[in-house]
């Protein structure tokens, strides 16, 4: 199996979930994932944010606010198969966020209601598979009310009905006050079938230390899963020095995939920050 950073477009798009997972592992912490909002006009108008992200060094693209019941990616020409067309244009694995809402959880802020096509359910997992997504991310946007317990339940459903790579975890509170890096929850996610565990990047949420993330990464690796650090706190719009520091610190912790979020301009990180992240963890040759 070739490293993802050595693969051609055709090789990337022909991988099954196990091959993609192994290819990421073989990169030894040199994989960049960019999250983009696909439901608003993109930064460059007639070019999708995903295409722009890939041109600045992204290996994987995660679509946020994607509605499986009304599949639309702004910036694409009209098509009945937007995910397949996007994959053809960028030549990279593409996934989407689906949110396991916990209606019984105590919220620490007003709950933000989302459409049914964004919920993590049997129906959306089936549609995500039909649309051609390579992976799904079970997480929560701000204020939607996603808990560790609801994520674990959703993993079991996704394992049965989706079939691709499953990413699971929280970038931030999502409106619920609970530990964001919790080994018991991580173990539950992996046992339920998660392939990649998402955690906040060190320096993005208050109080999360390198030691905690390093311990979690070692635990995740021992269980045969991959780790992903997320910049999901609008710091994707910070200066390049901040991004570089986050990138190196989280690579030192043992992270396999470094994610950069969508809260820069027009539903994506500042393009320069995607490149800064990529260069920091693998140099210009691989960017």
Where are these regions (language model features)?
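A beta-strand-loop signature enriched in Asp, Gly, Thr, and Trp
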Residues: 200-216
């Amino acid at each position: 199996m070739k490293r993802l950073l050595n693969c051609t477009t055709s090789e990337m798009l022909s991988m099954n979930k196990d091959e993609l997972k192994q290819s990421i592992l073989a990169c030894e912490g040199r994989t960049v994932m960019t999250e983009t909002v696909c439901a608003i006009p993109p930064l460059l108008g007639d070019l999708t944010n995903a295409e722009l992200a890939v041109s600045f060094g992204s290996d994987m693209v995660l679509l946020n606010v994607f509605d499986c019941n009304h599949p639309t990616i702004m910036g694409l020409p009209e098509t009945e198969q937007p995910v397949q067309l996007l994959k053809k244009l960028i030549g990279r694995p593409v996934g989407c966020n689906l949110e396991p809402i916990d209606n019984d959880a105590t919220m620490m802020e007003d709950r933000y209601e989302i459409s049914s096509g964004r919920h993590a359910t049997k129906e959306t997992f089936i549609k995500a598979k039909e649309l051609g997504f390579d992976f799904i991310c079970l997480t929560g946007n701000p204020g939607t009310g996603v808990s560790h317990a609801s994520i674990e339940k959703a993993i079991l459903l996704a394992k049965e009905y989706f079939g691709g790579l499953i990413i699971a975890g929280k970038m931030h509170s999502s409106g619920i006050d609970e530990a964001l890096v919790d080994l018991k929850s991580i173990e539950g996610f992996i046992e339920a079938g998660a392939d990649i565990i998402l955690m906040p990047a060190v320096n993005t949420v208050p109080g999360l230390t390198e030691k905690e993330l390093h311990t979690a990464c070692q635990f995740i690796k021992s269980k045969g899963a991959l780790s992903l650090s997320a910049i999901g706190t609008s710091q994707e719009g910070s200066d390049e020095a901040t991004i570089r520091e986050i990138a190196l610190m989280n690579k030192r912790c043992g992270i396999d995939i470094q994610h950069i979020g969508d809260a820069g301009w027009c539903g994506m990180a500042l393009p320069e920050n995607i490149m800064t992240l990529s260069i920091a963890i693998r140099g210009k040759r691989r960017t």
